[in-house]
Amino acid sequence: MTELQSALLLRRQLAELNKNPVEGFSAGLIDDNDLYRWEVLIIGPPDTLYEGGVFKAHLTFPKDYPLRPPKMKFITEIWHPNVDKNGDVCISILHEPGEDKYGYEKPEGRWLPIHTVETIMISVISMLADPNGDSPANVDAAKEWREDRNGEFKRKVARCVRKSQETAFE
């Protein structure tokens, strides 16, 4: 896939999301002149600890998208087993295609060129509702989620939700 084809695909996906918004998130370009860097706002899913949160993240697409997955990084602080302390999201759908050298993921769960920004965001929203404790990016958050979900983990998430509400539209 050429860079031009990649850019056209990203432009089409952005136009589709603006024309037919998907519940739970919105997306736009960080810079109108750069189709490869997007900003997304994710609304914490109802009936989860993240409910009411407004979390800002960036998606950075490779020039050969969709052959390779984008990278996603939360800009808003978030306490979650599958988000490392730098904000980088670690879920299967964002991992390079092919075999997992550690044997945790099946190839069909990893990146496939048929995925879109919409499928990525639906996966991230699902991740917020149901963390994967077996493959954590934040070991401390995963430990708290397993051992003290309604105690320390819940308090840290609540603090992140409050902070996200205060800084959502800065």
Swiss-Prot record:
Gene: UBE2G1
Protein name listed in UniProt: Ubiquitin-conjugating enzyme E2 G1
One annotated GO biological process: protein K48-linked ubiquitination
Residues with the N-acetylthreonine modification: 2
Pathway stated in the Swiss-Prot or TrEMBL entry: Protein modification; protein ubiquitination
Modified residues (N-acetylmethionine): 1
SMART domains in the cross-refs: UBCc
Molecular functions (GO terms): ATP binding; ubiquitin conjugating enzyme activity; ubiquitin-protein transferase activity
The entry's keywords: Acetylation, ATP-binding, Nucleotide-binding, Transferase, Ubl conjugation, Ubl conjugation pathway
Record's function text: Accepts ubiquitin from the E1 complex and catalyzes its covalent attachment to other proteins. In vitro catalyzes 'Lys-48'-, as well as 'Lys-63'-linked polyubiquitination. May be involved in degradation of muscle-specific proteins. Mediates polyubiquitination of CYP3A4.
